[in-house]
Regions:
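C-terminal intramolecular chaperone/autoprocessing and neck/assembly modules of extracellular spikes
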Residues: 1-74, 88-98
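Active-site phosphate/pyrophosphate-handling residues
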Residues: 26, 80-83
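Alpha-helical coiled-coil heptad-register detector
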Residues: 77-80, 87
Length: 98
């Protein structure tokens, strides 16, 4: 598959019930990146996450098929990573002040 730029609608005009993301950095960092081969032989040395494992940590990042984890919404994962980076920067700034 080839794709250009992926753009997801994100204007406040389309949103309601907005609240802060409640995700811990430890939970985000517990996601385990892996290298794998596809069972159908179509691709080797793919990198990614296991949907069933991510579902236990952040179900909103997982696409379900017939109620079972099937895929990961990788574009939304970036929001979680930004949250973790901000958390880590806050900790780093605090340590620098010591």
């Amino acid at each position: 598959m080839t794709a250009g730029t992926v753009v997801e609608t994100s204007s406040i005009a389309y949103k309601e019930n907005i609240r802060s993301l409640d995700a811990t950095t430890d939970a985000i960092l517990s996601m385990d990146p892996v290298i794998y081969d596809r069972k159908d032989g179509s691709q080797k040395n793919e990198v990614g996450l296991i949907a069933e494992e991510v579902y236990k940590i952040a179900p909103e990042l997982v696409h379900l098929k017939d109620g079972n984890p099937e895929g990961i919404k990788y574009t939304k994962l970036a929001v979680y990573l930004l949250h973790a980076i901000k958390d880590l920067k806050k900790d780093l700034d605090m340590l620098k002040k010591r």
